[in-house]
Amino acid sequence: MNPWRRYSWEIALAALLIFEILAFGVINPRLLDINVLLFSTSDFICIGIVALPLTMVIVSGGMDISFGSTIGLCAITLGVLFQLGMPLPLAIIITLLLGAICGLINAGLIIYTGVNPLVITLGTMYLFGGSALLLSGMAGATGYEGIGGFPTAFTDFANISFLGIPMPLIFFLVCCLFFWLLMHRTHMGRNVFLIGQSARVAQYSAIPVNRTLYTVYAMTGCASAIAAVLLVSYFGSARSDLGASFLMPAITAVVLGGANIYGGSGSIMGSALAALLVGFLQQGLQMAGVPNQISSALSGALLIVVVVGRSVSLHRHQILEWYSRRRNAHQA
């Protein structure tokens, strides 16, 4: 297939991203400053980190809406472990394991109950979120400040740059490369696509469906934990509400990136570009003085438009056939 046709959606997203930055740059010229542009990504790049493995979950025919609560639970757990005197490196490792366990819980419940993933992860969203609030209350960190007192080396980590690139953005780029190779260049990635197209056929074809689902959900949980660590470092405090606003932007990024909400197709490159597109949209609106409520409403509207547009695109032949029959009936 012609590369231009194969990556036409990603090319369109890249062009739209450039146009968006230039448009907001006209409103606020500061956004055209390369340093401002790069460092402004630190405010939203964790959404992209979570959106990458979430793409694999959705392509497999699944769904996970609990990652925001997982981020909050991992963040407050990191703070509590540090508060109890645990060495920070060990606390971070345990936090990453906790994120993976949250993902494994999701996968296990989905596989062994057969209940719709949306329903299961809705339940675990409240389970993990409630656990985070309980842990926060027990630690006396119910206020906006959360748990602080982290070493300067840790709090500086998410605010420093390497070769002029902010560290969170470097993490995102590394994650992009990892998940792109995993999804588009390995047998596991091929299995994810096949499961999304038909889990039953994949099962009959001796594809390890359960193992693949456990892996993609665990990676989403682990990515949520990575996002939690970066957010705690960036803000300098561990709070249970970190990640609470990630749900809509992350899902919008995955769907806008080209993933079929019913599974079977999707693109890591598309999700990465869409995450930047959604992030800069929110950032640009904020710099233009638009209230957060309107920004959230626009993100929701964007998600609806994309879902409807993708649905129309997938069923365009049936729509054209129906329109042709209607026109012929009127002419007769």
Curated annotation (Swiss-Prot):
Compartments where located: Cell inner membrane
GO cellular component, one term: plasma membrane
Keywords carried by this UniProt record: Cell inner membrane, Cell membrane, Membrane, Transmembrane, Transmembrane helix, Transport
Main location: membrane
Bilayer topology term: Multi-pass membrane protein
Gene Ontology molecular functions: transmembrane transporter activity
Pfam families attached to this UniProt entry: BPD_transp_2
Transmembrane regions listed in the UniProt entry: 7-27, 45-65, 70-90, 91-111, 118-138, 162-182, 216-236, 240-260, 261-281, 288-308
Role description: Part of the ABC transporter complex LsrABCD involved in autoinducer 2 (AI-2) import. Probably responsible for the translocation of the substrate across the membrane.
Similarity comment text for this entry: Belongs to the binding-protein-dependent transport system permease family. AraH/RbsC subfamily.
Quaternary structure and interacting proteins, as annotated: The complex is composed of two ATP-binding proteins (LsrA), two transmembrane proteins (LsrC and LsrD) and a solute-binding protein (LsrB).
Descriptive protein name: Autoinducer 2 import system permease protein LsrD
Protein source organism: Salmonella paratyphi A (strain ATCC 9150 / SARB42)
Gene that this polypeptide is encoded by: lsrD
